[in-house]
Amino acid sequence: MLYVSDINQLVEIDLEAGKVSNTWTAEDAKFLNDLAVDGSGNIYVSDMLGNTIYRLENNEFAAWLQDESLQHPNGLSVDGANLLVAPWGKDLQDDFTTKVPGHLLSVDLAGKKISTLGSGEPVGNLDGLEPDGNGAWFVTDWMAGGLFRISSAGDAELLLDMNQGSADLGVIGGESTVLVPMMMDNKVIALSVK
């Protein structure tokens, strides 16, 4: 099964049959975005405009955590007992800029405690979030454009300056190849990252 978000719905697609097999609606969602799956099979979905993370558990899709300190959550990734969140930033403006860009957050899955990864120094309007396989994470900055590696201590290293629109990303395991869709350029960039 493939799971995707679609504005206010989580959609399950049966790849073998080539059709939608189920949908769950989040009535109060404003803009569902990224998703991640924990070790128990629960699916977490960010609502960037609603400062909410939804969860599909036992076939029930509901708000799991709503908090302004999520800073407009975008990218998600499960790391053991924590849900990592790549937020867009604080004080979202009409043009989607923020007064304070985002930095990685960690949410304890058991207690829902939100903490900052590292110093909390702003990195960017974060979109994509994927582990690098070595204890750090790749993130993209959609507004300014860029691919970063963020260490487990929260230190950000700019790997590549890019155009605006560097969106969600994917990592081809074992190859250190990062795929970044460039929404404004209508292309996907493949990068070999060491």
Positions of PLM-derived features:
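Flexible "stalk/tail and boundary" regions
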Residues: M1, R55-E60, S77-A81, R149-D155, ...
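Beta-rich, blade/repeat-based domains predominating
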Residues: M1-L2, A26-I43, S69-D91, T98-P101, ...
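Short, solvent-exposed loop/turn segments at conserved positions within beta-propeller repeat blades
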Residues: S5, M48-L49, L92-G102, W142-M143, ...
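Asp-box/WD-like beta-propeller blade repeats and closely related beta-sheet repeat scaffolds
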Residues: Q9-S46, G50, A63-W64, H72
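A short loop-to-beta-strand structural motif that recurs across blades of beta-propeller domains
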Residues: Q9-V11, T52-R55, H103-L105, G146-F148, ...
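Short loop/turn segments that connect beta-strands within beta-propeller blades
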Residues: D14-K19, L56-E60, D108-K112, I150-D155, ...
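A short beta-strand motif characteristic of beta-propeller blades
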Residues: K19-T25, E60-Q66, K112-G120, G154-L160
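Glycine/small-residue-rich hydrophobic helix-like segments
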Residues: K99-E157
